[in-house]
Amino acid sequence: MFLKQVQHLAAILNQEVNMDVKEVVQRGYDLFGSGDMETFFGEIVHDDITWTFPGEEGKHPLAGVHKGKENFIANMSKIPEYWDNFMVTPQAMISEGNKVFALVKGTADGMDTMFGHYFEVENNQFKVMMTFDDTLTAFNAMKK
C-alpha cells in the first residue's frame, strides 16, 4: 500500500514538474519570436537534439540533418542572413505522447506561407525537430 502511495505521489509531482509537450513547443516559439535566443537555446533545446531539414544540401542553406546543440545553433543562426523579418507563428498543434506537430505561419520579407514542424520533447526540451517548409517560397524570398 505504501509503495502505491509513493508511486502516486511521484506521478503527481512529475506532472507538476514537466510541462505539457504542447506548452514546451509553444514556449519555444514564444522565445524564438521574442528574440530571446539565449533562453531558447539554453532551456528549450536539448544538448543531443537532431534537427532534420529535408532538401538537397548546398541548394538550401538549412538543408541537412543537424545533430547536437552546437550544429542546431549554427544552422538556426543562418536564418537572419537569408531572410529579413523572419517569423514563425503556430496556428495549431496536435500531440500524442511526447510528439507534437505544429502548423505554422511562416513570414519574412517576400514570404507568407505555411510550414509544418514536428517535435519530440524530452525533459521539457526539443530532442527531435523535423521541418517541413514551403522551400520554394522560402528560397524565392531568400537574400541572395
Regions found by a protein language model. Name each.
Residues 2-144:
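C-terminal and inter-domain tail/linker signature
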